[in-house]
Design a protein with these regions (language model features):
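H-loop/switch region of ABC-family ATPase nucleotide-binding domains
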Residues: 210-211
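Conserved catalytic segment of ABC-fold P-loop ATPases
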Residues: 218-225
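Conserved ABC ATPase "signature" C-loop
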Residues: 228-229, 244
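Conserved ABC ATPase "signature" region
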Residues: 25-35, 117, 129-146
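ABC ATPase "signature
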Residues: 234-235
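ABC ATPase nucleotide-binding domain signature region
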Residues: 3-15, 58-63, 67-122
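Pre-NBD coupling/linker segments of ABC/ABC-like ATPases
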Residues: 2-47, 242, 246
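Helical segment within the ABC ATPase nucleotide-binding domain
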Residues: 189-201
């Protein structure tokens, strides 16, 4: 059984040599949604999350909502094991793949074929697994002979196709996503959406951050509402979305 458990988790980002930066700190506070606390004359701390607790189990399809800077990305990175809490504890049991940045690990100067291996290794695949999936990834990308060219020579659309084909080739127990992934021309978008539904359907725990009410209604059975680093509401999808979007219209 897969399990994620957060117990009173807080995440702080220290900023040193911050004296005489009151305007910058204020702008940063607005941009991140976090709280700024001055520890000393030369140390300011931005609190991205504060006292967040939750338990996610098999079958949970979690939607994550909140304004820009509410702490969604910070929470996604904690759930992915990228950030370690500065206070509290995070327990993650199950193979986890994060699709927050699907181009993480890609080398612009390496060929498409080389980058399939680099990105796959970054996601935790073993060499044997990469070998087994390589041809299917290459075929799904639709890049053909361009796979022998450096990644930097690709158009932005081609780069995203390669990154998408590689990143979605896994079948994790826990899937963390920042928005729904879809890219390319109409033919590729159709194939990409089909693959995304297959990926979401096969995972045991899904966490999807999105601003789309329709997307969250379609894919999630529970929604978490973050505000200024705090968990404001946690409940059934319809109930939380009605409260959130109703509040946004006021």
């Amino acid at each position: 059984m897969s399990l994620i458990k957060l117990d009173n988790v807080s995440v702080e980002f220290p900023i040193y040599n911050s004296s005489s930066r009151s305007l910058k700190n204020r702008v940063l506070s607005i941009a991140t949604g976090g709280k700024i606390e001055r520890k000393t004359d030369r140390l300011v701390v931005i609190r991205g999350l504060e006292g967040v607790s939750m338990t996610l189990k098999d079958g949970d399809r979690i939607g994550l909502i909140g304004h820009n800077g509410s702490g969604k990305t910070t929470l996604l990175r904690v759930l992915s094991g990228i950030y370690t809490p500065t206070q509290g504890a995070a327990f993650i049991d199950g193979t986890c793949v994060s699709l927050i940045n699907i181009q993480l690990g890609i080398d612009p100067d390496a060929t498409g074929r080389e980058n399939i291996r680099l990105r796959s290794a970054m996601m935790g695949m073993l060499p044997k697994e990469i070998d087994e999936k390589f041809d299917a990834i290459a075929e799904f990308s639709g890049l053909g002979d361009f796979l022998d060219m450096p990644f930097r020579t690709y158009s932005s659309g081609m780069q995203l196709r390669l990154a998408f084909a590689t990143s979605t080739s896994v079948r994790p127990e826990i899937l963390i996503m920042d928005e729904w992934l879809s890219t390319g021309d109409e033919d590729f978008k159709e194939r990409a959406n089909k693959r995304m539904h297959e990926l979401v359907g096969s995972t045991k725990i899904l966490v999807l951050a999105s601003h789309s009410r329709e997307l969250l209604m379609k894919n999630c059975n529970r929604v978490l509402w973050l505000e200024h680093g705090h968990l404001k509401m946690d409940g059934p999808t319809q109930e939380v979305l009605s409260a959130y979007f109703g509040n946004a219209q006021k």
